[in-house]
């Protein structure tokens, strides 16, 4: 039987293959609020996401969905980064997003808290993120306890 969140309460659950339809509904809802996303939700996208849950290259991925009243209202995705550089495992925050209509209700904090708990259990002590440059995102990132903003991000295309 599928686990469903309680009505009116925010529940954070692991993003699994069977929750893809919920995540896609969330992504469509995001676009209804503000269509600034750089990818289309088409058959190829759905197929790629589905295959990713069965592909061993994605075994270091950690993703959670925040539910309210049976619908996804937020999502967080991260990946573990083990390195021989210093023998550590860090994590990279790939995406955290909450529906605009549900922001400022501690949804992002709950997602981040859930992820942080799992990272700590896995021996990860640092979560690295490239941050969105808009004011709302910057306020959120600056509000995170025990964090500091530094460095400059660069995106390098591998061709």
Which positions does each model-derived feature cover?
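Residue-level recognition of the GNAT/N-acetyltransferase active site
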Residues: 81, 99, 132
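Conserved beta-strand in the GNAT
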Residues: 65, 71-80, 92, 97
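A short beta-loop-alpha structural element at the N-terminal edge
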Residues: 10-25
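Conserved active-site alpha-helix within GNAT-family acetyltransferase domains
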Residues: 109, 121, 125, 132-158
């Amino acid at each position: 039987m599928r686990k469903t969140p309680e009505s009116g309460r925010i529940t954070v659950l692991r993003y699994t293959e069977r929750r893809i339809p919920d995540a896609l509904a969330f992504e469509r809802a995001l676009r209804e609020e503000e269509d600034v996303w750089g990818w289309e939700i088409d058959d190829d996208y759905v197929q790629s996401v589905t295959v990713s849950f069965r592909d061993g290259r994605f075994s270091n991925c950690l993703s959670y969905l925040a539910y309210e009243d049976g619908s996804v209202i937020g999502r967080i995705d991260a990946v573990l980064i083990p390195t021989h550089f210093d023998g550590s495992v860090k994590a990279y925050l790939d995406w955290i997003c909450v529906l605009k209509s549900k922001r400022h209700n501690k949804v992002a904090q709950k997602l981040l808290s859930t992820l942080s708990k799992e990272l700590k259990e896995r021996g990860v002590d640092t979560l690295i993120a490239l941050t969105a440059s808009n004011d709302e995102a910057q306020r959120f990132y600056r509000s995170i306890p025990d964090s500091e903003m530094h460095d400059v991000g660069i995106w390098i295309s591998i061709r």
